[in-house]
């Protein structure tokens, strides 16, 4: 499902623990790290996509997390030209994302990257809230900055 501007609707997931760290996931067989994210299917709400992607990519169920916040609007990034599939129709030039801030309420050992036949990640770790800005691929950096900045006020306060 690609919109008329060439952007694929998508959800981004920022999962926090009780001390305000975020889950940072390593893409399978790569030294590339990112937040979990995934496309929104036809007739699926962003929240429905969030829970489907959370389960597919991280192994968590709706009862394992609490939604703390969501970005107000869509945040967009363009793919580098080398990643645009120019022979695909409709042409996808990037992603438009709704970002969700979640708190893990279930046990940490419920995080599993290997529950699907085609896992996207093969590892994860907790990192400080702003750490991903310096690590994510360049073309996603501005969207990460905007999402983290907008959602930061809703981050659980450390006791």
UniProtKB/Swiss-Prot annotation:
The organism's place on the tree of life at top rank: Bacteria
Cofactor (UniProt): a divalent metal cation
Extent of motif Nudix box: 38-59
EC numbers: 3.6.1.-
Keyword Hydrolase: yes
Residue intervals of the Nudix hydrolase domain: 6-149
Single GO term (MF): mRNA 5'-diphosphatase activity
Keywords: Hydrolase
Keyword set includes Membrane: no
A biological-process GO annotation: mRNA catabolic process
PROSITE patterns the record matches: NUDIX (PS51462), NUDIX_BOX (PS00893)
Gene3D superfamilies: Nucleoside Triphosphate Pyrophosphohydrolase
Root EC class: hydrolase
Gene Ontology, cellular component aspect: cytoplasm
SUPFAM superfamilies reported for this sequence: Nudix
Family matches, as PANTHER family: M7GPPPN-MRNA HYDROLASE
UniProt similarity note: Belongs to the Nudix hydrolase family. RppH subfamily.
Protein function: Accelerates the degradation of transcripts by removing pyrophosphate from the 5'-end of triphosphorylated RNA, leading to a more labile monophosphorylated state that can stimulate subsequent ribonuclease cleavage.
The protein, known as: RNA pyrophosphohydrolase
Organism listed in the record: Stutzerimonas stutzeri (strain A1501) (Pseudomonas stutzeri)
């Amino acid at each position: 499902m690609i919109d008329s501007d060439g952007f694929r609707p998508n959800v981004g997931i920022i999962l926090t623990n009780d001390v305000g760290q975020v889950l940072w996931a390593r893409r399978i067989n790569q030294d590339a790290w990112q937040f979990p994210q995934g496309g929104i299917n036809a007739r699926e709400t962003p929240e429905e996509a969030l829970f489907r992607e959370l389960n597919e990519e991280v192994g968590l169920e709706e009862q394992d997390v609490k939604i703390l916040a969501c970005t107000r609007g869509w945040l967009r990034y363009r793919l580098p030209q080398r990643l645009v599939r120019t022979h695909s129709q409709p042409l996808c030039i990037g992603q438009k994302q709704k970002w969700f801030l979640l708190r893990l309420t279930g046990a940490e050992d419920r995080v599993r990257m290997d529950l699907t036949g085609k896992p996207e990640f093969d590892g994860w770790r907790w990192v400080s809230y702003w750490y991903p800005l310096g690590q994510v691929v360049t073309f996603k950096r501005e969207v990460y900055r905007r999402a983290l900045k907008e959602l930061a006020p809703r981050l659980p306060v450390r006791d």
